[in-house]
Design a protein with these regions (language model features):
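Acidic Gly/Asp/Thr-rich repetitive segments characteristic of extracellular carbohydrate-active
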Residues: 264-296
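Extracellular beta-strand-rich solenoid/capping regions of secreted or surface-exposed proteins
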Residues: 282, 287, 302-316, 324-364, ...
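Extracytoplasmic
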Residues: 37-259
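Short glycine/acidic-rich loop motifs that flank beta-strands on beta-rich extracellular proteins
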Residues: 293, 304-307, 319-320, 324-329, ...
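Leucine-rich solenoid repeat scaffolds
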Residues: 606-675
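Secretory targeting and sorting signals
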Residues: 1-38
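Right-handed parallel beta-helix
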Residues: 321, 358-369, 388-399, 410-425, ...
Length: 696
């Protein structure tokens, strides 16, 4: 594959390798010292992070979750720290914080518990099989207190069956496959292979992605703060290597019980998972609706191999660690009317064309699917349909195509306190005509497309709010994306580590979306290690980026109080596509009270007609010039077609493309000075740190 020689990840590796060697030496020294004195040393202090940064840097932003997250690169290990690196198609780029720990047989990584815990989640990667489809391999879990093991050792059986996609959209599980779309432009050869002679060849597997999966484990007892969780790769296992990215630890509450309810067991649901429970759940739902009861599903693993259609009912589980719905992806005998060729476990409202569903409340259970490939016509999502006047809370969704996909028109849905991980595509999508709905306190990790999206295709979404959510490590597209719509809000979210063909926060007039109208407010969001490299354009994006493709973006768009930390390339980007550069514009976006802490290149990159205003936008650790202004590339009258308005208070300095030394990051470039350099040298910024107001 072709990689940018300017990419900061490439230059960091040598430094990180040296640092890792020193760290491993120190670990070995500590172990030797403990043996020499004949007594155990105290455990290493727990390092708790959020999105792999100090929690103080993102306080008040993102989801409040019951677990504490620890990065493996901050733990004690006899393995090797890999990364940091941000090049797509690499294991380290998809890791939280862009670093992880690689273990081989006999090696371990140890995490000191920061609080009492009885459950853990391990995010990991192991190799695929040579022909695709994954392998399984063990990972031993033990707990050490004052140098001695306590409790029972446990073994996790890791799998890569739900990891690894390859090639071009819509991707494949086959690492040996030839190009899926030879008629498309391919950046690796800078050509259209089907139109090129001699035909180019490509390294296989081509464009590997989606390296990670995660697994939860109840430990059987509560361990104390300061105990050490040791993850060890046993001597014999199928995996040549095991990469551990992070460990979440939490104290899970006892199962919830509902006595005055329609208990699913009484209708034949099987908590052992041996028999399909779908029909039993239908019976329980019918009984509950007739008698105005909730459906209660006690602890157990329930096999469900189709959709459960819900309308006017509450489904209450014992908790997402206890009540688990799972099943196989099932091939249909003939395509369904909606184009699906598979079905699988999921809870669906009636479709809007059938009147939709109302007053549905889904609480405190897990849905673990069996989706391993992307078929965009398939309805194999965890939750779907149209759900008005409804709520979803306390769910855990894994291994479905999309966690929650809603097709409007529908109104007044609340999605709260839910975890969505390891999705083939989006975590959540409001698709067409979803109104007055809220997504709050949702934690997302490892999606294969946008984390949270509002997509106004054919019908405008309006009056919706994405608030206090965390989105980490989406392997494709954006953390949060808004495609058209009216009067929507994105507030107090935390987004980190997007990988390619998207970035942290995105506003786009594309994919056939209805126009932006009314207002769009993006307020108090934080993006960490965003501003990715766009492989097709061969340029860097912004941590937040606006893309006018189908039409202008000219609504009342305000970005207020956002923080952009450690952006690989730019903090802010406004762009159109070359083929429409003289037809579309981005007008009147207002940036206010924004902090930019570290960019590889610029604070603002403008590659479009239009303009934006800046007030109290402060920047430090800027890698190149404060502004890359290309406009629409026509450069009329010595300027560009994009105007920057300085409303004052924009502090901080950057390099200047015209003279030596530094200048105010914005003032030198106002109103439309052409400073067009899409590929300047990239300077990797320092890690985010407590804010000190810049001057200049």
């Amino acid at each position: 594959m072709i990689r940018s020689t300017n990419h900061p990840g490439a230059r960091r590796r040598a430094q990180v390798a040296a640092a890792a060697a020193v760290a491993l030496t120190l670990v070995a020294g500590t172990a030797s010292s403990a043996l020499a004195h004949g007594k155990p040393q105290p455990p290493a202090p727990a390092v708790v992070t959020r999105a792999a940064v100090d929690p103080a840097l993102v306080e008040g932003r993102g989801a409040t979750v019951p677990f504490l997250e620890q990065e493996a690169e901050n733990a004690v290990t006899t393995g090797t720290v890999i990364g940091p690196g941000r090049d797509a198609y690499t294991v380290e780029a998809e890791a939280s914080g862009r670093s992880a720990v690689r273990l081989t047989a006999g090696q371990n990584v140890e995490f000191t518990l920061p609080a009492d815990a009885n459950a853990i989640t391990v995010r990991y990667s192991i190799p695929d099989s040579p022909t695709g489809g994954g392998i399984t391999s063990p990972l031993d879990v033990s707990v050490v207190r004052q140098g001695k093991k306590v409790g029972l050792d446990r073994r996790m059986t890791l799998t890569s069956a739900y990891s690894y996609l390859y090639n071009q959209y819509p991707f494949t599980n086959d690492p040996t496959a030839d190009l899926l779309q030879p008629g498309w432009w391919v950046t690796e050869c800078a050509c259209v292979p089907a139109e090129t002679s001699p035909a180019p060849t490509f390294e296989k597997p081509f464009r590997p992605m989606k390296f990670y999966d995660e697994q939860r484990l109840l430990l059987g007892q509560t361990y104390k703060k300061g105990d050490v969780v040791r993850l060890t790769v046993p001597a014999r296992g199928a995996a040549e290597w095991t990469v551990v990215d992070l460990l979440d630890s939490e104290k899970v509450a006892p199962p919830k019980v509902r006595l005055l309810a329609a208990n699913a067991l009484l209708f034949g649901a099987d908590p052992t998972g041996r028999r399909d429970s779908a029909d039993a759940l239908d019976k329980a739902i019918a009984f509950a609706k007739k008698h105005r009861l909730e459906v209660y599903v006690p602890p157990g693993v329930y096999q469900v191999n189709r959709h459960i259609v819900v309308d006017g009912v509450t489904i209450q589980g014992a908790g997402s660690w206890y009540t688990i719905f799972t099943g196989k992806e099932v091939a249909l005998d003939a395509p369904a009317p909606d184009g699906s060729v598979h079905t699988g476990v999921g809870f669906y409202g009636k479709y809007a064309a059938e009147g939709g569903s109302r007053n549905v409340h889904l609480r405190d259970f897990a849905i673990v699917g069996d989706v391993r490939e992307r078929v965009d016509t398939d309805q194999v999502n965890g939750i779907g349909g149209a759900l008005s006047d409804s709520s979803i809370s306390g769910l855990y969704l894994q291994h479905t195509k999309v966690g929650l996909w809603f097709d409007g028109p529908m109104d007044n849905l609340r999605v709260e306190s839910t975890v969505i991980v390891d999705q083939i595509a989006d975590a959540l999508n409001f698709h067409g005509g979803v109104t007055n709905s809220v997504v709050r306190n949702v934690f997302v990790r490892s999606t294969g497309d946008d984390g949270l999206a509002m997509w106004s295709e054919k019908l405008a979404n309006s009056g919706n709010v994405f608030e206090k959510n965390t989105i980490q490590s989406n392997t494709l597209a954006n953390g949060i994306a808004v495609y058209g719509g009216t009067d929507n809000t994105v507030r107090a979210n935390l987004v980190a580590d997007p990988v390619r063909e998207g970035s942290g926060l995105h506003v786009g007039s594309r994919f056939g979306a209805e126009p932006f109208a009314g207002y769009l407010h993006l307020t108090d969001n934080t993006a960490v290690r965003a501003g990715t490299y766009e492989l097709n354009w061969n340029i860097g994006l912004g941590a937040i980026w606006f893309y006018a493709l189908d039409r202008d973006i000219d609504a009342d768009v305000r970005v207020t109080g956002d923080h952009y930390l450690d952006s690989t390339y730019n903090a802010i980007m406004l762009v159109s596509d070359w083929g429409v550069k003289d037809q579309v514009a981005i007008e009147g976006v207002a940036f206010k009270d924004v902090r930019v802490d570290g960019t590889g290149t610029s604070v603002v990159s403008a590659r479009v007609r239009g303009g934006a205003s800046f007030e109290n936008v402060d920047a430090r650790n800027v890698g190149w010039a404060g502004v890359n202004n290309c406009g629409a590339f026509n450069f009329p009258d010595g300027g560009t077609e994009f105007t920057l308005t300085d409303l004052g208070g924009n502090d901080g300095t950057s390099l200047s493309p015209w003279e030596p030394g530094t200048v105010n990051w914005l003032g030198r470039f106002v109103p439309s000075a052409p400073s067009c350099n899409d590929r300047p040298p990239v300077v990797a910024p320092p890690a985010p740190s407590p804010w000190v107001q810049p001057v200049g």
